[in-house]
Structure formats: structure tokens, C-alpha cells
Regions:
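Generic preference for flexible, low-structure residues
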Residues: 42, 46, 76, 82, ...
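Intrinsically disordered, low-complexity regulatory segments enriched in Ser/Thr/Pro
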Residues: 68-94
Length: 125
């Protein structure tokens, strides 16, 4: 069991490193192309309300629920809402980027991170 856990951890770290490299390459290419970062907003759980954040970066999906900030960190832009978030803004924390977005989701749709990032760069052409 310990060997399986170690192998899973090794695989997870390798995937996170590969995804981090894809994100870093995306930021460099977006800057090279002059794709301007924008102020990012977050959505409340359940899709209710939009909340300001202090983040600047690029949305990478049409739902505007995932983004890469100017520092090259991946963010899932879904936050608990509430009065505090409405008044002071939300503070979504960065998370490791997955290599496949939506893997294991109920709708069965999944998209490789590389594809999402390429599409976003294609929007700038």
C-alpha cells in the first residue's frame, strides 16, 4: 500500500510540474504577443454573483471560472460568496493546475490544459 501511495504521489508531482511549465509558457507567450491581462473576477458557489479580486491575468475558459494570473499561478475562480466578499472582494488562492480540466466531472467533458491555453492564445490573434 505504501508503494502505491508513493507512486501516486510521484505521478501527481510530475503532472503538477508539467502543468506548471505549461502555465509559465502561456504567460511568457501572452506577454510576447501583447495580450493584455485583465482584472479577474470570481463567481460565488452555485454560480451566484460575481466578486472583484485583486488578481490580474487571463481567463482560460469561456465560463471565466479558471484563470492564470500575471505571476503564472493557476486559479479556480469559484469562491464562497457573502457580504464580506461583496464589500471587500474575494481572495481566490492559487492551486496546482491540472493537466486535464474537468477530468472526473459529472458531465463527462474534459479538456487538456494545453488545449485551453492554446485556445486562449488563439483569441489574441
Amino acid at each position: 500500500v505504501a508503494a502505491h501511495a508513493a507512486a501516486d504521489e510521484h505521478r501527481r508531482r510530475a503532472e503538477q510540474a508539467e502543468a506548471a511549465e505549461l502555465v509559465a509558457d502561456f504567460v511568457a507567450e501572452a506577454r510576447r504577443r501583447g495580450l493584455p491581462p485583465e482584472r479577474l473576477t470570481a463567481t460565488g458557489h452555485g454560480g451566484r454573483g460575481r466578486y472583484r479580486t485583486r488578481l490580474r491575468g487571463w481567463y482560460v475558459d469561456r465560463a471565466r471560472s479558471r484563470a492564470v494570473d500575471v505571476a503564472g499561478r493557476f486559479h479556480l475562480l469559484v469562491v464562497p460568496g457573502g457580504l464580506r466578499a461583496r464589500l471587500f472582494g474575494a481572495d481566490p488562492q492559487p492551486s496546482p493546475a491540472p493537466l486535464v480540466i474537468g477530468a472526473g466531472g459529472r458531465d463527462g467533458e474534459s479538456v487538456p490544459l494545453r488545449t485551453l491555453l492554446r485556445r486562449r492564445l488563439g483569441d489574441a490573434d
